[in-house]
């Protein structure tokens, strides 16, 4: 199998690149930083043991610390789910990712969450309640409260 670049995110300053790389069965997120005119060697953001498989569609908030991405894995509700991780400035690594739960995740594929803190708008890309091969982009106003996946009873 041939490895490919699946999706990528470049911050507004053009000096932080986060991308999904892998093959048709698995992918992981990597990051590289631009120093002067050169990019650093890509480094994986998470260990394989952190329960995230087929990571894709990264989005780094303007704070440069909060990362949202879609992934499948043992902590998924179904299909792709949105996960969040924050960057530890002291250690220079991302914390273990967490499934952000309802209402952003569902049993369908939830691909991308992007939030504009300045204009207080968010976008969710999902295929829930869509015909095969189609997605819907929901626009929403972010709030401070959310239900965590681990706090949700889906039975």
Enumerate the predicted regions with their spans.
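Short, conserved micro-motifs composed of acidic
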Residues: 1-155
